[in-house]
Amino acid sequence: MARKRTELPLLEKVTITDVAAEGKAIAKVNDLVIFVPYVVPGDVVDLQIKRKKHHYAEAEAVKFHEYSAVRAVPFCQHYGVCGGCKWQVLPYSEQIKYKQKQVTDNLTRIGKIELPEISPILGSEKTQFYRNKLEYTFSNKRWLTTEEVQQNVVYEQMNAVGFHIPNAFDKVLAIEKCWLQDDISNRIRNAVRDYAYQHNYSFINLRTHEGMLRNMIVRTSTTGELMVILICKIEKEEEMALFKQMLQYIADTFPEITSLLYIINNKCNDTITDLEVHTFKGKDHIFEEMEGLRFKVGPKSFYQTNSEQAYNLYKVARNFAGLTGNELVYDLYTGTGTIANFVSKHARQVIGIEYVPEAIEDAKVNAEINGIKNTLFFAGDMKDMLTQDFINQYGRPDVIITDPPRAGMHQDVVDVILFAEPKRIVYVSCNPATQARDLQLLDAKYKVKAVQPVDMFPHTHHVENVVLLELKD
């Protein structure tokens, strides 16, 4: 016999009290912690419990009785449906306050180590149109809003280009205007969409993988260059001819595009790292500039998506490193070598290590472009590359700069850092929780001397944090 489904309760007139680490807000009812999206502290709401565990629950606000005094009006028409920019309902001054609190809470509760006063967060000067890269998805299954569903009509146009709906991978929200990237991105996306509608191009079915148009990536840069990459599935010659007609339309309509590229992806997944990139018009790259340095950005290159704030982040890291020109610096998780090349003129030598071979090739090219002679770059898994033998061969670092992925550093990597005993460690993190865990391990030999949070992603809960550690006496 089937188990009887438990009715989940409706809680009335609950006050939202705080913001959680993952961007949802918090309410407490009889010692039960409830996580709620799209509300802010001070809202009084009715909550429909959606999922209940022993110590916490997840809920949806189904009715507002009072709006918080700090609530802001969302500026995006897609707010609440699109999975991005969930903090639009918080004024930016409140967003950075909670991000500062997130850093403090993680370092104190997880790290449990002695800390100096944490510096005020560096907010982003741009809070809209701050990203230099967006990826759009095509789909023949457009997400219908609640209002559209309630109209109970059959929609002729179900193709869409936009963003995936959270927890519904095969559905895409049709985006009319996104506030994350320069408006040229909106104009290109909408023009491609309209051209595809008018000429009956097929959009991919994300379940069956049938259809031509798959993805489009737009990259902008502070130099004014513009890259567009169109990704499609092509199995017949006539499809290729049709696709090139679209590419020519894009080139003619947007002469400001300096790099128009395309990729044929006939696989069942969206990864493009193993696929050939073809140039339809212009160059196969664009450039970013920072303090006179030029960084080559290709279609597959990683580059921090908020260029202006990345510069501020790197300046903090360089300042914390305290370089005099005589130091050997290790840059761990160097990516395309941006930090390594950025600090190179202040160091004797910089050694960068990164898992992705293509990123290391970009790092070498960027060093060559800028005439930098004192960098060495190595590709390989960090825990396999950074060993005592490596240090014995290339020298004991005076300073280590580490910028690991969200998972933080492997225990073996921490152990080798402790063995190397650099005078200073600059730890750049996109996840203060795993950073706090690693700081606790480094506490065996190091003392935290400075902490500087940096907001790279306004209207999201994400926060970067830079920590300076010095070797204890």
PLM feature spans:
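Short, conserved phosphate/pyrophosphate- and ester-handling motifs at nucleotide-, phospho-/glycolipid
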Residues: 42, 181, 306
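Terminal RNA-binding accessory module
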Residues: 1-78, 376, 384
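Short, acidic/hydrophobic/Gly-rich beta-strand patch recurrent on exposed beta strands
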Residues: 25-30, 162-165, 231, 363
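Extended interfacial segments that mediate partner engagement and assembly in macromolecular machines
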Residues: 63-73, 83-202
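Internal alpha/beta scaffold segment
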Residues: 170-206, 210-212, 234-261
